[in-house]
Design a protein with these regions (language model features):
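Juxtamembrane helix-break-helix junctions at the cytosolic face
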Residues: 61-79, 100-103
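Core segments of alpha-helical transmembrane spans in multipass integral membrane proteins
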Residues: 17-19, 26, 41-69, 83-91
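Individual transmembrane alpha-helices with interfacial aromatic-anchor signatures
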Residues: 87, 107-121
Length: 141
């Protein structure tokens, strides 16, 4: 069980760190250099979307970290939130795998790193979710 708990905390912590990191992505990768500034509404919309996504990813993952002990007991809600985040990461991994995450130039390493890490996190979260499903079935028997 220690390995499963380690996997749970690792995946939720990593998800939270991605949420925190995403707050700084527009500046780190100079998003605004690629956008025509005459479309200020577009820039504001992208900023709002990124900020809300980052806050939801970071906040939800923080909740999962705080509810870690509950997830390994009979608390169904914490498992359901974990399942929801698993679906999000599976969708993200599918997008990164089958659709180019962004043009590879000028920062190809970032696109490849996103592909590898989102696929790895999705697989790990899927494994943890399957373990939770097994635990829930065993409790009901």
């Amino acid at each position: 069980m220690k390995r499963w708990k380690a996997l749970y905390y690792t995946t939720t912590a990593f998800s939270m760190l991605v949420g925190l990191w995403h707050f700084f992505v527009p500046t780190m990768f100079q998003w605004y250099d690629y956008l025509p500034m005459q479309y200020e509404n577009l820039v504001v919309g992208i900023d709002y979307t990124n900020s809300c996504f980052s806050a939801l990813l970071c906040g939800g993952s923080l909740l999962l970290l705080l509810w870690g002990k509950r997830a390994f007991t009979d608390n169904k809600e914490s498992k359901e939130l974990y399942f929801f985040y698993t679906i999000i990461w599976l969708l993200r991994a599918a997008l990164a795998t089958w659709i180019e995450p962004w043009p590879l130039e000028p920062v190809a390493w970032a696109a490849y790193l996103q592909l590898i890490m989102s696929d790895l996190l999705a697989v790990c979260m899927l494994a943890m979710s399957l373990k939770f499903i097994t635990m829930m079935k065993n409790k009901s028997n």
